[in-house]
């Protein structure tokens, strides 16, 4: 695992180093949803997200991270961290190449971790103030560890993704993000569907539905997990 982390760190630094003379500042948003319930039953949940990006001439660098933890009556039921880095190089207003790194640690999925590095091509179908729609596909390498058997495996994967945003009103935006990694040992599918409602230039409320599916989870683990969230969003 140490070598994998070193590889990912080296790739991230190499991708970030590709720069030009004129760079826009980092822009993005942070989200937080925290619930503490006490009474006949005790439950706690924490849902944190960070998404930020920066454009440097033809380059765009993006960082995404999320953390989810939930417990009921002192018994933990969810504990997941997902982090990703992507660098895009624009060939034109619509086409781009990408290099991406992704790391996921989900305590209750049956996999101790799933880590991948990939590259490929993308296309922007819409890129307006109202609608944004882009897709991408490519190949990569993924390493995962079964937390039931303790075995680690790695193989080539096909990766695909879609990002969609639609400003249906001046204050309301619909978001859909899809990600897929398919290899011989497992196919990971994730989809986030959300609605954001602006309260001010910086603050918004976001309601989301997150679906995750592993087609070949370890024995005794379910294939599909879903999470419904309500977060406060701060844009910067």
What feature does the model see in each segment?
Residues 23-62:
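Short glycine/proline- and aromatic-enriched beta-strand/turn motifs that initiate or cap beta-hairpins
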Residues 26, 42-46, 77-81, 113-117, ...:
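Residues that define the transmembrane beta-barrel architecture of outer-membrane proteins
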Residues 26, 58-63, 94-97, 129-133, ...:
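Repeated loop/turn-to-beta-strand initiation elements of outer-membrane beta-barrel proteins
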Residues 32-34, 63-67, 83-85, 99-103, ...:
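Transmembrane beta-barrel strands of outer-membrane/channel proteins
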Residues 34-36, 52-54, 89, 123-125, ...:
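Residue-level signature of outer-membrane beta-barrel architecture
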Residues 34-38, 56, 67-71, 103-107, ...:
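Transmembrane beta-strands of outer-membrane beta-barrel pores
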Residues 36-44, 72-78, 105-112, 147-149, ...:
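Solvent-exposed loop/turn segments connecting transmembrane beta-strands
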Residues 118, 195-198, 204, 224-236:
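Outer-membrane beta-barrel "beta-signal"
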């Amino acid at each position: 695992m140490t070598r994998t982390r070193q590889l990912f760190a080296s790739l991230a630094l190499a991708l970030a180093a590709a720069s030009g003379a004129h760079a826009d500042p980092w822009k993005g948003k942070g989200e937080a949803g925290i619930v503490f319930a006490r009474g006949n039953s005790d439950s706690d949940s924490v849902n944190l997200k960070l998404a930020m990006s920066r454009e440097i001439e033809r380059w765009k660098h993006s960082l995404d991270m999320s953390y989810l933890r939930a417990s009921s009556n002192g018994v933990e039921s969810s504990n997941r961290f997902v982090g990703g880095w992507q660098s895009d190089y624009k060939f034109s207003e619509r086409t781009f190449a990408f290099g991406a790194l992704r790391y996921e640690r989900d305590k209750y999925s049956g996999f101790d971790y799933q880590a991948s590095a990939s590259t490929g091509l993308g296309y922007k179908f819409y890129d307006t103030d109202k609608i944004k729609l882009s897709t991408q596909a490519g190949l990569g390498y993924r390493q995962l560890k079964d937390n039931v058997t303790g075995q680690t495996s790695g193989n080539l994967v096909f990766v695909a993704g879609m990002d969609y945003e639609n400003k249906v009103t001046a204050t309301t935006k619909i978001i859909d993000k899809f990600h897929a990694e398919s290899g011989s040992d497992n196919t990971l599918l994730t989809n986030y569907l959300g609605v954001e409602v602006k309260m001010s230039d910086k603050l918004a409320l976001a309601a989301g539905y997150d679906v995750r599916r592993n087609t070949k989870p370890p024995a005794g683990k379910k294939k599909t997990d879903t999470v419904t969230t309500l977060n406060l969003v701060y844009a910067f």
